[in-house]
Regions:
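STAS-like cytosolic regulatory interaction modules
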Residues: 1-50, 61-99
Length: 99
């Protein structure tokens, strides 16, 4: 789900449930599309209950695309399981993570 914010500068992409090998490609497609259309993409992870390495891969690819496009990717509302995974892998230092 996407919500436009302000003057078409940013968009919120809401993820929910499990982000895994089956669902990560869809998340990546949505983030890639949003990053080509907006200067800032906020990924709301508050509804995510599980994430595996495929989900992390989608986040890293989106971050790399954001850098190439001159856009900003922000992760917001990540719960315990996602925060733990980001910290264990060190990605919390490479991705913009907000409460």
């Amino acid at each position: 789900m996407r919500d436009d914010q302000g003057q078409h500068e940013s968009v919120v992409v809401r993820a929910c449930g499990e982000i895994d090998l089956d669902t990560a490609p869809g998340l990546h497609r949505e983030l890639a599309r949003a990053l080509t259309e907006r200067r800032e993409v906020v990924l709301d992870l508050s509804g995510v209950t599980f994430m595996d390495c495929a989900g992390l891969g989608a986040l890293v690819r989106a971050r790399n695309q954001a850098e190439r496009c001159g856009a900003r990717l922000v992760l917001r509302g990540a719960g315990g399981c996602v925060v733990r995974l980001l910290r264990l892998t060190g990605l919390h230092r490479r991705l913009t993570v907000e409460p």
